[in-house]
């Protein structure tokens, strides 16, 4: 994998705030990741060019971020532009155009071959197990033609988008049902 991507670890929030003496930094946190993962579609055609970044840890729309605690990856949405990665996250920088970002997401999040490799290499104790960057670099991925990668990546993104809509729809149905049930109880008194 290391021939296609570079993994950039996040930074220690407290140390950074002390060193930079700045309260203005907004950090990419678990809520940010969840917002991106249960996502709005990120249009990669409108993603900002990497040269516009203030530093390597400042995020732009379309960047790929891995949650070290969940061992899942997602695309950064416009809602999290310019946030800085904390230690809980790793940024994936693509070195070449040989690997599609959405295809990478599919491989990292779902593909059984990569899942087995990740499970064997998990480190830590307790409920949160992490994958070291060295191990991420050594993941073996199937490389197929770029057009096929793009097709698989688009399908995977559409499935995630559809799942997000279904989840929101399910929440609305539950709220609506609960509201009707409460009103029927109040009306019954």
Residue ranges and their predicted role:
Residues 83-90, 123-150:
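A short glycine-rich beta-alpha junction/loop motif
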Residues 2-16, 31-61:
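Sequence-specific dsDNA recognition surfaces
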Residues 1-24, 143-189:
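Non-catalytic DNA-recognition/assembly elements of restriction-modification systems
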Residues 67-109:
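A short beta-sheet element
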Residues 18-25, 45, 57-59, 76-89:
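Short, surface-exposed loop/turn microsegments at beta-strand edges and helix-strand junctions
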Residues 80-85, 118-124, 159, 165-166:
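Alpha-helical membrane-embedding segments
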Residues 101-125:
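Glycine- and charge-enriched low-complexity intrinsically disordered segments
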Residues 3-8, 51-53, 65, 75, ...:
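Charge-rich amphipathic alpha-helical interaction elements
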């Amino acid at each position: 994998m290391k021939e296609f991507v570079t993994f950039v670890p996040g930074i220690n929030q407290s140390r950074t705030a002390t060193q930079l003496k700045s309260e203005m930094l907004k950090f990419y946190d678990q809520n940010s990741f969840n917002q991106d993962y249960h996502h709005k579609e990120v249009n990669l055609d409108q993603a900002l060019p990497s040269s516009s970044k203030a530093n390597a840890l400042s995020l732009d729309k379309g960047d790929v971020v891995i949650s070290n605690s969940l061992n899942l990856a997602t695309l950064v949405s416009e809602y999290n532009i310019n946030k800085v990665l904390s230690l809980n996250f790793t940024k994936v920088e693509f070195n070449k155009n040989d690997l599609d970002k959405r295809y990478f997401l599919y491989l990292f999040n779902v593909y059984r071959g990569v899942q087995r490799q990740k499970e064997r290499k998990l480190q830590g104790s307790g409920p949160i197990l992490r994958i070291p960057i060295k191990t991420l670099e050594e993941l073996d991925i199937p490389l197929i033609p770029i057009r096929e990668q793009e097709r698989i990546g688009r399908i995977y993104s559409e499935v995630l988008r559809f799942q997000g809509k279904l989840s929101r729809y399910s929440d609305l149905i539950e709220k609506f049902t609960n509201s009707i049930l409460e009103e029927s109880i109040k009306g019954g008194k």
